[in-house]
Design a protein with these regions (language model features):
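Class I Rossmann-like S-adenosyl-L-methionine
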Residues: 1-193
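Conserved SAM-binding loop and adjacent beta-strand
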Residues: 196-198
Length: 198
């Protein structure tokens, strides 16, 4: 990369304006999933059929659909069902093996998806549980926290309005900020009236 990954993704979307919001969300979340789980996915992508780029893309899409809030449900089984219409039977079987993989059998650096230099630094610090918790947190998709413009809106009212919309996300108060909202899922915020109005 010659730029941060989010800029690479943004540049791609500018070059491909015909992509819809759902396509953009799936592509972006798949790319970031591959980066978050690079060691694990690279090791598994060394097997299977097709090009390694396709295998990595399929693993990224599976992660985006099962963990990124973009699939029909946040489970590997539903991600496989969501992908079934675009993959070959051998790819389906390969992805099923990946979903059933016992990650505890992987080498710690691969399982925790950390670069070697960072893993070595982690190993030299005390607290196995803290290291493991941090590694797991770094593999999760980032949550979306927003600050409510209290001049224009009240957080509790806005939470009610957002959750009344239904859909595939949920808005909850942030744990620390009295003016914050944490959004679970990947809503298209730019289309909502309350977001446009500030």
């Amino acid at each position: 990369f010659d730029q941060p990954s989010d800029r690479v993704v943004s540049r791609y979307f500018r070059a491909e304006p015909q992509l819809g919001n759902r396509d953009r969300a799936l592509i972006a979340e798949s790319a970031f999933a591959i980066l978050r789980r690079k060691n694990e996915m690279s090791q598994f992508a060394s097997s299977g059929s097709g090009t390694q780029a396709r295998r990595l893309a399929l693993l990224g899409m599976m992660s985006a659909l099962s963990e990124g809030g973009l699939g029909s449900a946040n489970r590997p089984e539903s991600a496989l069902a969501d992908l079934a219409h675009v993959i070959q039977p051998s790819e389906y079987d390969w992805l099923k093996r990946y979903s059933e993989l016992d990650r505890d059998t992987l080498a710690p650096m691969v399982r925790n998806n950390l670069p070697e230099w960072l893993w070595n630094a982690f190993e030299s610090s005390p607290g196995e549980t803290q290291r493991q918790d941090l590694a797991i947190a770094l593999m999760r998709p980032a949550l979306l926290d927003l600050r409510v413009n209290t001049i224009k809106a009240n957080r509790d009212t806005l939470l009610e309005e957002m959750n009344a919309l239904g859909g595939r996300y949920q808005a909850v108060p942030t744990p620390f900020s009295p003016d914050g909202i944490r959004i679970m899922g990947k809503p298209a915020l730019q289309n909502s009236s309350w977001f446009k109005e500030g």
